[in-house]
């Protein structure tokens, strides 16, 4: 750019074009590969789930969540890879806006969940009860629920009585499981032999009487309390989700403005070459079709 216009050069001009380009290529490629990996794992998990599932519902299926997440990451990251390789302003702007929208939506979702904390907890508890109804028919939910109940020493969603929603654990049901809870709710030492009937006839007990046999606290509150007690892990998790997206938006913005500066430099140079050269207005709309710099 001519010296007389140097004061108009944006701050991003201090960044090397090649440094920004290769940084964005590496950033996009890494998440493109991660998205492909997540998508592959999700497809494989869903194929395995289809072999053994007895329900048509995809409720709380981790495979479905992985597939959706993988598709979004794969497509968005591919746009970033293509845009950074081609220096295509339209694709670069689309990539930046998509990342920005995702980031804003996640922040808004988190804020709304905090503001309406009670409603969020009720929503989670209702969905857990729906899963409990099909506990023995949905292997994915069963594995997740068993892991959470053992890991966080809890039982059910709101509390242990949620297990009455299951047809086998309802107190009016026939069979040995009636009015009981799964053994993963039981209080036991790691050295004890697993007693799968340890939760026998506990749903109809009062909390004070049941708390010496099973974990009476619900898993929703148990998980929330664990996150609050381990706030460093929570902060690290949030940073791990939000920071890469923010860096992607910032890096893309810097690269877009750097490419625009180069386009402007070329336009000014072409204008000095003679009347037959393309002016800035002639090249202003070509950012979606052409690659810069030549």
UniProtKB/Swiss-Prot annotation:
Q: Which GO terms describe its molecular function?
A: enzyme binding
What the entry says about post-translational processing?
Answer: Palmitoylated.
Q: Which residues lie on this side of the membrane: Cytoplasmic?
A: 1-23, 84-94, 257-294
Keyword list (alphabetical) reads: Cell membrane, Disulfide bond, Endosome, Glycoprotein, Membrane, Transmembrane, Transmembrane helix
> Where does this protein chiefly localize?
membrane
Bilayer topology reads: Multi-pass membrane protein
Q: Name one GO cellular component term.
A: cell junction
Q: Where in the cell is it found?
A: Cell membrane; Late endosome membrane
Which Pfam families does the record associate with it? Tetraspanin
Paired cysteines (S-S)? 154-219, 155-185, 171-179, 186-198
Glycan attachment points? 118, 189, 230
According to the record, the segments passing through the membrane are 24-44, 63-83, 95-115, 236-256
GO biological process, alphabetically ordered: negative regulation of Notch signaling pathway; protein localization to plasma membrane; protein maturation; regulation of membrane protein ectodomain proteolysis
Subunit:
Interacts with ADAM10; the interaction influences ADAM10 substrate specificity, endocytosis and turnover.
Family listed: Belongs to the tetraspanin (TM4SF) family.
The protein's job, in short, is: Part of TspanC8 subgroup, composed of 6 members that interact with the transmembrane metalloprotease ADAM10. This interaction is required for ADAM10 exit from the endoplasmic reticulum and for enzymatic maturation and trafficking to the cell surface as well as substrate specificity. Different TspanC8/ADAM10 complexes have distinct substrates. Promotes ADAM10-mediated cleavage of CDH2. Negatively regulates ligand-induced Notch activity probably by regulating ADAM10 activity.
Q: What is this protein called?
A: Tetraspanin-15
Q: Which species?
A: Mus musculus (Mouse)
